[in-house]
Amino acid sequence: MQVSVETTQGLGRRVTITIAADSIETAVKSELVNVAKKVRIDGFRKGKVPMNIVAQRYGASVRQDVLGDLMSRNFVDAIIKEKINPAGAPNYVPGEYKVGEDFTYSVEFEVYPEVELTGLESIEVEKPVVEVTDADVDVMLDTLRKQQATWKEKDGAADAEDRVTIDFTGSVDGEEFEGGKATDFVLAMGQGRMIPGFEDGVKGHKAGEEFTIDVTFPEEYHAENLKGKAAKFVINLKKVEERELPELTEEFIKRFGVEDGSVAGLRAEVRKNMERELKGAVRNRVKSQAIEGLVKANDIDVPAALIDSEIDVLRRQAAQRFGGNEKQALELPRELFEEQAKRRVVVGLLLGEVIRTNELKADEERVKGLIEEMASAYEDPKEVIEFYSKNKELMDNMRNVALEEQAVEAVLAKAKVSEKATSFNELMNQQA
């Protein structure tokens, strides 16, 4: 076997291989012997068919199969010998073949980039230092009560957190526009559902009032004909309702799994959940900064084949989220996923090099801790832990999570890490 390797462009490689004629003939004869043992031909017993008849009937197809097998095996031998690491599926380009002559073919593919990590010492990471305070717990309890609130009609003016029922008609330059009119529209104030200025224009008015407000559509508004346009809305305010928050009664508290129904028990449960969320948020914040720094410090070429493969993964995930099938997934425009796919491939290659250079392996104690932490959010943690322990795929996924964490920690060990006091609310809003 003769082998030559050339660089086509960037990460592209072409391996040209020549297989000696005698190697081909030896393999063909060997395969014909195997075929002769199995075939049945009228007039001959099984395994007793003369070789010349077997060759006459099956020689062409056997030769084709043998060539395909030799091309594959010789390519594998070549990349092992040349220490080449292909990325993605290779493209075989066969040359002209004549029986009794050497056979030359080429294989085109991309290789993984040679990653040499640099700049880890210059990465800056700001680690949030946060405590869950009693005030944070109070806010969360209010949120829980608001989620369970009922609405009661009131006579006064609409406030920032009230709910209103309105009719409205919008116009731009005196002309009504599509989607700018509604009847008995129920609007919960303070959720940012409407364009800027709309809710402010409703606040302070009472049921039974009709009034006009002036607003401006944002420049990034989805409707092209309305971007940045000044508009008027004629509004008929039909009903104003305010929230009635439930009291922290024993019955209410037990809805959240607090068996003794006490306020102290509810506060303890809420605090525990908030601290679990906080731990994850801090970890994610630090991780995202470390990875961002790693990417900025290491500009690497990325094999197109890996990006294409990642795009297909993202397409399928998107289709699953919205109830689509395989065919619909592959029809989604690649432009929607290209940037994210490239980013994921780059991060994977860089973290892979961190893992390789630091000789990291998944820490089983960390894996166990991650599963226990995740399971604690469920009603029966033991059942979840047992379910994971019996599922190889889930366990492998969690090992990958642990290994990624260990890689990030290896980056952080060399990075410049500082601490910054932050509130619970500020950190969680950054995560949103």
From Swiss-Prot:
Keywords: Cell cycle, Cell division, Chaperone, Cytoplasm, Isomerase, Rotamase
GO CC field: cytoplasm
BP terms from Gene Ontology: 'de novo' cotranslational protein folding; cell division; chaperone-mediated protein folding; protein transport; protein unfolding
EC category: isomerase
Location in the cell: Cytoplasm
EC number, as in UniProt: 5.2.1.8
Entry remark concerning the domains of this protein: Consists of 3 domains; the N-terminus binds the ribosome, the middle domain has PPIase activity, while the C-terminus has intrinsic chaperone activity on its own.
Matches recorded under PANTHER family: TRIGGER FACTOR CHAPERONE AND PEPTIDYL-PROLYL CIS/TRANS ISOMERASE, TRIGGER FACTOR-LIKE PROTEIN TIG, CHLOROPLASTIC
Free-text function comment from the UniProt entry: Involved in protein export. Acts as a chaperone by maintaining the newly synthesized protein in an open conformation. Functions as a peptidyl-prolyl cis-trans isomerase.
Name of this protein: Trigger factor
Originating gene: tig
